């Protein structure tokens, strides 16, 4: 698959999903509020007025068509919020916790025991880790679910400044030092991301069978004639305007 076909497939899938979401919204009686309609109108004005006459001609688009597109995306967004409002998306602060650690990694028990002995004798964690990790500083941020379970358990049980005993995980041996047991701003961001993941997972479980039951026909002749390489760069972004004025 070449890049042109890949991009077009992504756009096609997005447009089909939005169309199907609008069908579901109609069946569920989901409509835009007056405030949302005003926001859509403002977004369409902003987008259309930013285009030159040459760009309007090249796109072969009218203001009404642009407003219809903003409307359909707004309805899809409203449906998503309506469906996902029915579930509990709460994520605990501990589940979302982001920590920062340093670690020493060795391929054998004897090597990691040697590293531990050096630490016990007062050498700095950084200097020992550097010897085992080459020039790279073995420091990283960690979230739950990203590491081997034994490594994760040991890392998340540490408080800031604490060092673990020897941990075996994935066929290797580690000593872990916690430099921060809670990166608070990143924990909050991760909490939001995990809640969004829960929403998307639930929505997909509800929507995908519905979408599969619908047949959306596209004008293949027109669609196949479109090439992303021939698309001129526009002074405005549909997605940016939608997120700023409508979402």
Task: Tell me the role of every PLM-derived stretch.
Residues 4, 8, 12-13, 17, ...:
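Hydrophobic (often cysteine-bearing) scaffold residues that line and stabilize catalytic clefts
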Residues 125-134:
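Short, well-ordered alpha-helical segments enriched in acidic and aromatic residues
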